[in-house]
Structure formats: structure tokens, C-alpha cells
From Swiss-Prot:
It catalyses: ATP + H2O + 4 H(+)(in) = ADP + phosphate + 5 H(+)(out). The gene is atpD. This is ATP synthase subunit beta. It comes from the Bacteria. Its EC number is 7.1.2.2. Belongs to the ATPase alpha/beta chains family. It comes from Xanthomonas campestris pv. campestris (strain ATCC 33913 / DSM 3586 / NCPPB 528 / LMG 568 / P 25).
Amino acid sequence: MSQGKIVQIIGAVVDVEFQRNEVPKVYHALKVEGTAITLEVQQQLGDGVVRTIALGSTDGLKRNLLATNTERAISVPVGAGTLGRIMDVLGRPIDEAGDVQASDHWEIHRAAPSYEDQSSSTELLETGIKVIDLMCPFAKGGKVGLFGGAGVGKTVNMMELINNIAKAHSGLSVFAGVGERTREGNDFYHEMKDSNVLDKVAMVYGQMNEPPGNRLRVALTGLTMAEYFRDEKDENGKGKDVLLFVDNIYRYTLAGTEVSALLGRMPSAVGYQPTLAEEMGVLQERITSTKSGSITSIQAVYVPADDLTDPSPATTFAHLDSTVTLSRNIASLGIYPAVDPLDSTSRQMDPLVIGHEHYDTAQRVQQTLQKYKELKDIIAILGMDELSEEDKQSVSRARKIERFFSQPFHVAEVFTGSPGKYVSLKDTIRGFKAICDGEYDHLPEQAFYMVGSIEEAVEKANKMSAKA
């Protein structure tokens, strides 16, 4: 193993000089002697000097310290030993529960599965959240993005999906916390512990307070652990079905921007790194399903200033099967989850995949909401009285649909005081079809707010009329 010495330190960037015939390769990990710091080689500058990014604080580093080349990329523990544990970007435990007992270590930089090994699935994944199941259904083994600005409920939606899918799903889950709040990571750990599914979840965190190198690589660490579960075959030659949760993919891009600037690259549009599309592709192309096992990934995507055309969310869109767009306007009406049914999409929205009844109901709901959206300007200027009877009926049904899309969440029980509701896909389709058919035109729209199935709305309406 070759050794070099540190010649320059600028923030998180460390230059190390080696003998010219022993220069480490790009992405090789270097260990700094006498410290716990790992450096990752990013560039070869010539004359034996390599430029590296520190994975950890550079406090206490000084020139002439020795750095040893490990001659391989960062390797992290994989396998059953990671379940129930919280680890950092290097796979070191941060939950004070002793060492991670792993039989194997995998490098975090890996090639994506070849085209012939990949498989696509059209099997639906039921989430129990009405608006998602109806308007932008998820595919098993697909990629889902939760898009939203600050404070519209990305993390709460993700926690509810974890609650509904990970608990019902008998397989394994990996949670990668990329540049998010430490408190949320802590809440997630206790949530999993209280619901007795901690032994099926591996958690990897590189939170907001950590250097950019950690935040850039932690998504790859979590993905590597998920890939192991997918690819490790049992006695029947089958891998596992894994759920991968990433919160937040925007922070991965942001860390890439910071690293790019530190390395002195020219910025591109809006100050992002010139390699934005490639960096996103390197991560997303590996999140895929193969013939032996599947990775279903749910990623939260922060939208800066609510601008979906920003290069970061715009680049992410291309890689996803379903997009769930959270809207500030809907949140301001008090409708949660604040999913915009007209802006959310899914590749599964095809009658041959989801069935004609589901497809037709979703289309009718969309048409009713679109008509209401177009009539809003007229209503604002002239009022409801100027509308035709048919338009009044459409507006009334659209407002009921909007309210029926709201739903109490299990993870928000502590705040709202109302118990969470899981609504099956069959009940969801039946409820919305009945509203579109006008079966509930006689009920007040308030009855549809924050209920589960359509029967609960009828029951709520009866209670309201009894009180009146």
C-alpha cells in the first residue's frame, strides 16, 4: 500500500502527494494516519499529486501528515448485520450499539445492472393513500419521486408510505437520510422501533451538519446495501424485494454542487455542477429491478422556490416512473396530503395495466377537477350564480372530490388527534366513481373532508345533519 503526504488543505479539499509511480486511482479511498478521516480521490493533478474530498471534518489535519492508499473505493458493510442499525457514510455505526457484524463489504461505486439483467414489472403497489393510488399509482420495482417546496409535507408523506408499505411489506427496507434534519432521522428510528419493524430496516445517515463529501456519498452507501439484498440469491436462486427510501435527493445534487465548486469546476445553469445529469444518472441507473430481485425506491425531492423547472428537480423527473407533486395552494386549503392530482403522473396510468374501471374513474376525476380549475376565474369575478346548472354541478362534485382526497395519516395522529386511515384501492375507486356518478350530490362537501372510505363520509354527513 503506497503512502503519500498531505500538501494542501482548503476546507473539505485535501491535496496529497504520492510517488509518481504510486498515484492512486480516482475514487480510491485514502486513510489519514493518526485520525479517523477517510479521503476520496477526485482528480489527478499530475506530478504525483491527487485532489481529494474529505469524508468528515478536516479539523486537526495539517501538512505533511501521511495518507495511506487503501487501493480500493470506499467499502461498506452489507448483509443481515446492517438491519436494525444506524450507520454513517462509511458504514460505521452511530447508534452506540457496538460494531456492525457484517460477513461482507461492498464498494460503493458499482456498475448498474446490464440491460439484459434488468426486468420491468407492471404489478401495482397499493399505498392506502387515496390520491396516490387513484391518480399516480406506484409500480412494484418502480421509482417514485415526491416533489414539493419547503413545508408542504414531503417527509410526512414519505413517513406515511413507510408506515403503510414497509410494515405490510414482508421484505427489507433501506433508508438513506441525505442532508436532512437529524431530528427526522431520530423520529424515524423510534417510529420503526415502536412498530417492531426495526429488524427489517437498515438506516444510513449523512445529515445537514456534515461536510459535502458525506452528503454526496451517503446515497450511494444506502443504495449499495439495498443492492446486496436484491442481488444476494437464496437457495431458490431468488434475490429479495427491497424498498429504498431516500430523503432528500435534492441534497445529493446540492452536495455535488458544493464539491464541484470546491474542486474548481466551472458552474453551469443556476450555479449547478456541469456534471449534474451524469451524477444523477450514476445514482438512478443503479436503482433498478433485476430478474432475481427488485428495488422499489421512494425519493423525496425538494423543489427550490417551488420552481419545478429548476435544473435539479427537472433532471430527476426523467428517471422516475411516478411523480407525486405536492402543491402549496392545496396545502393552504388545509387539504392534506397536499398532492396536486392534475400535476402528478404515473407510467402505470394505462387501462391495460390498472384496468378499465380504475383508468376511467381517474380520467373522470381529472376532467371534473380541470373543469373546476377553468371555472375558478369566472366564479371569482361573477360568482357561482352566473354558472349554468351543469357547471354548478361540476363545481360541486369537484369540491367534494378535492375534500375526499384528504385523509388522516397514521404518522400525524399525534398532531391531529384523529386516527390514521388506510383505504384499499377497491374502496378508493368505488368512492370516487360514486361521487362522479352523482350518488352523493345531496351530501354537504364538509362531510368528505378528512375521512377514509366513502362510508365514513356518509356517516359524517348523518352526524352533521343530526347535530343541525
